[in-house]
From Swiss-Prot:
Species the sequence originates in: Prochlorococcus marinus (strain MIT 9215)
Enzyme class: transferase
Name under which the protein is recorded: Ribosomal RNA small subunit methyltransferase A
Encoding gene (name): rsmA
Cystine pairs: none
UniProt cross-references to PANTHER family, sorted A to Z: DIMETHYLADENOSINE TRANSFERASE, DIMETHYLADENOSINE TRANSFERASE-RELATED
Gene Ontology molecular functions: 16S rRNA (adenine(1518)-N(6)/adenine(1519)-N(6))-dimethyltransferase activity; RNA binding
Length: 274
């Protein structure tokens, strides 16, 4: 298929990056080397793919959902030994055979699957721990990136921002206007890099799961004070003990609690519940 004859499908949320400066910027911040095994999610017509394959990398494995693009991509990169292509939905496709080989994940994420993508790929930096990702580079909706970067006390702080910051160091590179895409979306995007927290600083798996539990309970009623959310799992006596041992005021709302305080709350809650 000729790429000029292909028309985007709205159901896939396709907004292809056409800004050459941003394409070059992604390649630059990836800091590619001959040992890199790249996973590219949703290569589209292959503009970014071509940039990455032009670098000294070991392998690029692309996952594409749109069946009409499979032939186009195969025709375009069939003669490149560094390229492999898998047809499937990134939210459900089996990557077990290559997951431990992947060093960097790069994607222009469709807005409609941003949340699930973050859960899968940033989540792997934590509980799953069966990956060697050095860096995850996502081009994604600006307001989601702004939420992820929110600190305690911000109205945008939430379970998403706390979980992402627990598992990775996050750096926003730049904002990207709608005109950089074809067709242009209605909102701005941001280019962001996630790097896994140093192994020595990673949380114990059971502790990480308990933090998730506390976040889920607390942010389900984010306008309520901690005392009025955690009472679903703690008695008044236990809450008083937890507040004192963690040095956290239970009159605070969840968005006002720092990451270190969430860690303390989870650590001490586990002790109390033993």
């Amino acid at each position: 298929m000729n790429s000029k004859n292909y028309h985007q499908k709205k159901r896939f949320g396709q907004h292809w990056l056409v800004n050459k400066k941003i394409l070059e910027k992604i390649k630059e911040i990836a800091v590619l080397n001959e040992n890199d095994f790249i996973l590219e999610i949703g290569p589209g017509k292959g503009a970014l793919t071509a940039k990455l394959l032009d670098s000294k990398i070991k392998k690029l494995h692309a996952v594409e959902l749109d069946n009409d693009l499979i032939n186009l991509l195969n025709d375009k990169f069939n003669n490149n030994d560094k390229f492999s292509l898998q047809h499937g939905d990134i939210l459900s496709v089996n990557l077990d055979s290559i997951n431990k080989k992947i060093t960097k994940v790069i994607a222009n994420i469709p807005y409609n699957i941003t949340g699930p993508i973050l859960d899968i790929f940033i989540g792997r930096l934590g509980i799953i721990r069966n990956c060697n990702y050095e860096k995850i580079i996502f081009l994604m909706q600006k307001d989601v990136v702004d939420r992820i970067l929110s600190k305690e006390g911000s109205p945008n702080a939430g379970a998403l921002s706390i979980r992402m910051q627990l598992l990775s160091k996050i750096k926003k590179i730049c904002d990207v206007p709608p005109s950089s895409f074809s067709p242009p979306p209605k909102v701005f995007s941001s280019l962001v890099v996630f790097e896994p927290i140093n192994d020595n600083l990673r949380l114990d798996i059971s502790l990480e799961k308990y933090i998730d539990k506390l976040l889920r309970i607390s942010f389900n009623s984010r306008r309520k004070m901690l005392r009025n959310t955690l009472n679903s799992i703690l008695s008044n006596e236990e809450m008083n003990e937890l507040s004192e041992s963690s040095k956290v005021c239970f009159k605070l709302r969840p968005q006002d609690i720092s990451i270190n305080q969430w860690i303390k709350l989870a650590e001490n809650c586990i002790k109390i519940k033993k």
